[in-house]
Amino acid sequence: MLEKYKLKNGATVLLDHVDGVRSASIGLWFRAGSRDETPQEAGAAHFIEHMLFKGTASLSSAELAGRMDDIGAEANAFTSRDCTNYYMRVLDKRMPEAAELLADMLFNSRFDEGDMSTERGVIL
């Protein structure tokens, strides 16, 4: 059964438990997609999506990828017209670590000039 909670900060949390399933997914959805961008900002949401995988204040991109591998995470993100989503799928016992990594990516990402230059060529 789907459970829905509203946090004090306005975020909505949805939980769905499926008996007998040992995998768990965490996804963070943001109402920020291409339709929210002006012509001068075109590609910004997609650019930021890529940059969040380029490392954090405490983890290089290689270390971040290594930590994801260590916990067996399938991690990805996408940007659509309406939203941007970051997600990981792991074994249920690894969910705390997956949530910690996603939080680190969202709150502590490094926007390294070299990485930004590379991603500008890919995205913009």
Task: Locate the predicted segments by residue.
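N- or domain-start disorder-to-order transition segments that initiate the globular core
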Residues: 1-23
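M16/MPP (pitrilysin/insulinase) zinc-metallopeptidase core fold and M16-derived inactive scaffolds
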Residues: 20, 25-89
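Charge-rich, well-structured scaffold segments of protease-associated domains
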Residues: 6, 17, 61-124
